[in-house]
């Protein structure tokens, strides 16, 4: 996509990859129950020890211990995604102005899903977490306001992927 929107700076690629990872991690956290119904688990096995696919599919509010383990893993995924979003934002300055706002809004909408997941730890096994039109509109307005200040914000790229030698990140 970088070539399509005219990104020429090589530092932009690292940030773009990290932004994509942040968004994908949000998807993983949001879709735990839905994915389990399709016989898929994307949470790292070492974050959910002794929890099977069947456990994920049949989780309910009465199975607190397993629910707590899954909820903690989801929280870790969201916390990790935040670090990747920050790296993505660090590279926005390299993206042409014509594409920058749209990318910033999309990233903040996805990040908003993560914030909503964090605020309701038990919702993941009842329904898919999404943002309603009001929440999306509010995030869009905030993003536009923050967008003005991006050149003055001190987003610093930090190497994250190197710190996960045993993970597929």
Segments from the language model and where they lie:
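Catalytic cores of Mg2+-dependent Asp-rich isoprenoid enzymes
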Residues: 2-22, 29, 33-169
